[in-house]
Amino acid sequence: MKSRKSYGHLLSPVGSPPLDNESGEAAAAAAAGGGGCGSSAGYVVYGGGGGGDSPAKEQDRFLPIANVSRIMKRSLPANAKISKESKETVQECVSEFISFVTGEASDKCQREKRKTINGDDLLWAMTTLGFEAYVGPLKSYLNRYREAEGEKADVLGGAGGAAAARHGEGGCCGGGGGGADGVVIDGHYPLAGGLSHSHHGHQQQDGGGDVGLMMGGGDAGVGYNAGAGSTTTAFYAPAATAASGNKAYCGGDGSRVMEFEGIGGEEESGGGGGGGERGFAGHLHGVQWFRLKRNTN
């Protein structure tokens, strides 16, 4: 079996910082142009990590070949096969490409006295290295990524602000105050998303998903009614009275009544086939989630 060839050196652009597996002595010698390290076509050849002659660790220089193989198979027909030699060739090319682009972007950051390489730096480096044809599509991917990250930050920030407001007022968590404020949680938020997904089947069958929850003390009942086609779940918290008996009546369907039970309570099987039970417990920003029981009258 043909053995994999091992390289005892790596190429990095002149002036770029040494890679993680390069020793400080080798990097200093390369920058000074001595110590047995030569340069070729504007690139400095660094010795292997620490020992000079010892090659760098393979896992530090190359992407996992299994990942490379999976990516290659995505572009091939189902009956196509890939030789070991082709996998290793792509693995080495892609790994070296990452080193070249990162080194070029690092030079730009050093000139601008910045420590963090961002996506724009990498796209600039690819343009400098002659990959202009790929920069356009990658810019669109970068913009999509930033938009997704921005939306995620907005959702998390909005949920955190609502929780802080509840803590500050002390109406539902501190036991004081006669009413509870309504809270709107986006469907993409982890907990709200779980609620909307778990009740999606009920929305298909019953035309509406109903759930109730209690927050903090025992006098603030909260319920929601998710309309069809809506990705945002609106929670409303009417003031609980003695007559309501810890029940939340969800708008739009008068036959749906939600009863609250403690976390330690036992689950009861609903009579007939129409009753479905939902139980979950957790603690988020001081909000205590209680076991819920859904009854159909």
Swiss-Prot record:
GO terms for molecular function: DNA-binding transcription activator activity, RNA polymerase II-specific; DNA-binding transcription factor activity, RNA polymerase II-specific; protein heterodimerization activity; sequence-specific DNA binding. Residues 1-25 are annotated as: Disordered. InterPro entries: CBFA_NFYB_domain, Histone-fold, Transc_fact_NFYB/HAP3, Transcrpt_fac_NFYB/HAP3_CS. SUPFAM superfamilies: Histone-fold (SSF47113). This is Nuclear transcription factor Y subunit B-11. Residues 90-101 are annotated as: Subunit association domain (SAD). It is found in: Nucleus; Cytoplasm. Gene3D superfamilies: Histone, subunit A. Pfam families: CBFD_NFYB_HMF. The keyword Repeat does not apply. Belongs to the NFYB/HAP3 subunit family. Coiled coil: none annotated. One of its GO terms (biological process) is positive regulation of unidimensional cell growth. The gene is HD5. It comes from Oryza sativa subsp. japonica (Rice). PROSITE patterns: NFYB_HAP3.
